[in-house]
Every structure is written in structure tokens, then in C-alpha cells.
Amino acid sequence: MTQGVTPISDDERRGRMDKARRLMAENKIDALYLEAGSSLFYYTGITWGRSERMFAMVLPREGEPAYVTPGFEEERAREQIRFGDDIRRWEEEESPYRVVAGIFKDRGIRTGRIGIEESVRFFLFDGVRKEAPALEYVDATAVTAGCRMIKSPAEIALMQRANDVTIEAFKATVAGLREGMTPAEFRADCAAAHQALGFSGGVMVNFGKYSAFPHGSTLPQKLQKGDIVLMDAGCGVEGYRSDITRTLVFGEPSDRQREIWNIERKAQDAAFAAAQVGATCESVDAAARKVITDAGFGPDYRVPGLPHRTGHGIGLDGHEWTNLVRGNTTKLAPGMCFSDEPMLTIYGEFGVRLEDCMYITEDGPRMFTKQSPSIEQPFG
């Protein structure tokens, strides 16, 4: 499934930096500081692992970006840098924070506001602040989230492929369910299925009563006939994530399992129907929660019931801006992407979660995947 995958173009990345500069101007930010991570990849296409050594980019409101790299990594950095040629190295005994402060000075930023990308680690931020104390340091989420929350058609196409891959991997893994299987064996099978399709993916899976734990149990499990199987998996395509959960029964479902599964599906449908342009994020959560409460569960986050938000944003990170949760008055706009995953948790018995991701269009929400038709048919 690797054929036909189109990476994000350099022109699109330049457009992202231009949008960041416009948002910086609106928020009176003179430069943006980012370290290695998904936002750096978003703007530049650079993939770089985090360590104690700083690799960073400064994106000024005016002018090309500047990069800070360990001296011995300069050649590797140059392999990936495609925007701007201001590459500054620091040797092992030198201060990278002083190098960043030098960029601010050289770009004429002696006073003003520096936006810190929200995932920057404290020791990096603190080091920069001490070297350039005359500057004000502010949260740059208005810039980064302002860019990343709205996906382009190219991004949505990559997310579509990631979802297609995970569904196929799920199908292959479910075909191998067997009595006595452990979660570790299921995880290995699912990883191998993703790999066979050309991508790296992983899964969380729980059986029976342990399916009630939203993020799983650490206790030993072995699959038995009649067990609920709750599996939550995803993969990345050019960095863009899928996130899908399916719940089925190994064997013949009981009336109770079928009843709870059907309530969960109605809650997922209610959230999807509510996810219209201009609706608030909290109204989507409320729609799903009402179905579960009306069925006699909850209320609020009480269990048996729905113990967590209805969904989260998704893109380059499996969880990103913004959440479908009570109190979030952000309005849905075309290009936003979310998971739709209310859950019905009944500790001591089982849990059911159905998760499909959706993207918002002018005409309403669209699912990346076909929803589960029934507890007997996990794949549409």
C-alpha cells in the first residue's frame, strides 16, 4: 500500500511558514522557537530525535529560518534543511543557548516577544531565556495550533492512507485470533500486518473484563471464547497518523454484549451527526454523552458510563489540537480532524469503544473509515 503516497511539497511547507508569520504578527510575536518534534517536521520536513543536545529552529517574523545544530551533526542537518541557509553549529563545550541568542541579535530582535512552541522542554527554554533575558517569552500555541489544526487536502490524503492501512492490518490480525492468545501475541501479529503493508504500526488490545480499562490493563490475559476483544491501533504515513478502535467478541456475542455495543454505536453516531461546521467541540461531546446517559449510564464521567472525552484532534501527532470535550467552545471548521470515540466502560464486566476518525468539510463531517456495522461485523 506504499504506491501513490505523495509527500507534502516544499511549496506547501513554505505556505505553512508564511501562515505562521501572519499569525505571529497577529499575536505580536517576533520569532518562533522550535526544537526537534512534530511542529519542526510540519514546517520543514526535518525528522530529528530529541536528546540532551539541542537541535532547533528559529523562525523570525521576517526573513528565512535559522537552525542550531550540534557541530558533529552539521552534515546530517544539511541533508534535510531545505529552507534557508543560516545553519549555526555549536561544539560540545559551547553553549547552544548563546547561539540562539546570537540569532535573535543578528535578526534585530533585541526586545520583543519570542514564541515558544508548547512541547519545547523546560531546560532548553530556560537556557535560551537566561542568555537573552531582555526578551519576553510567550506560549506559541496560537501560531502552531493555528496552522496545524486545519488540514490541507494533501494532509487529509495521507491520513486517509494511514487509516486504510490500519483497517487492512486489523483484518489480517483478527483473522488470526485464537483461544489462549495473549495481548503480546496480538500486538506482534498487528505490527507484522502493518509491516507487510509497508508501514510501521502498533496496537493496544485487551480481552474480556480488561476491555473496560480505557488504556488497558497490565495484568496477564489469555483470550477465551465469549471474550470481548477491544483493539486500538494506528500507524503513520509520511508522519500522519491513524487511530482506530474496534470491539468484537471472540465467538458468539451474548445479548448483554450486543446491547452495550449497540448503545456505543448510537453514541458514536450522535457525535458524528453533531460535528457540523460552526458547532462547538463541547456540543459534540454532549451529543454522545446524552445517548449513554439516556441509556441509564453515567451521568457525566461516572462509570458504568463514558469516563473520558468523546474525541481528540489528530494529525502528525496521535493526539493534538483540539479536543471534543466539555468546556471547549472552539468551533468546528473545515479541515479539522478528530477521533470519534465515546466509550462505555463497565468495570468487572467489559468495555466497548468504537473509534473512527473524521474530518470536517463545508458539507459536514466525513469519516476516514467505514464504521463497524455490528458486533459480529467489525469492518464495514
Named regions from a protein language model:
Residues M1-G380:
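Active-site neighborhoods and metal-handling regions in enzymes and metal-associated proteins
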